[in-house]
Amino acid sequence: MTENPYLQTSTQPAAAGQTHILDETECWRLLAENSVARLAVSDDLGPNIFPLNYLVKSQVLFFRSAPGSKIVSLTQQPRVAVEIDGTDGGKRFSVVVRGDVRRLNDDAHIHESTVDTLPTMTGSDKWNYFAITPRQVTGIRFRTSR
């Protein structure tokens, strides 16, 4: 059996108290203060991840998309996960939203959510609007050595 070369350079587990579970209110605050996430979907080939810019309104995540594999995946399997991470107050955080995505077809709902005004990362036209209704929102905050 070959020895694991990474075992010798691995860091020790975080000391007790360095990782904190965030309550849902704090998770929503972080989600509202950020606008870029990763969208995890699943299709016939398995999991896939897409960069995503989003907005939060009434504890629902809204985004827009151009036609392509992301929309195909969302149609095949509407259960998704969204993850954001970053630095807040000198500590790292990660927030994960698991939920169900639905396409928005009603113009009034699209305008009310303001997703139609959401800038796109690529600057391309994106006329497909979606909402993610959370089933679960979780988050952690932790210190790093960097």
Predicted regions, residues:
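Extreme N-terminal tail/first-helix region
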Residues: 1-32
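A short, compositionally biased
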Residues: 32-35, 76-77
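Short beta-strand segments
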Residues: 34-66, 82
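Short, surface-exposed beta-strand-loop junctions and turns on beta-sheet-rich folds
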Residues: 45, 69-72, 146
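Short acidic/glycine-rich loop or secondary-structure boundary segments that cap or lie
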Residues: 49, 62-64, 71-72, 91, ...
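General beta-strand recognition
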Residues: 60-62, 131, 138
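Short, structured beta-strand-loop surface elements
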Residues: 67-134
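Short, charged, intrinsically disordered terminal tails
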Residues: 138-146
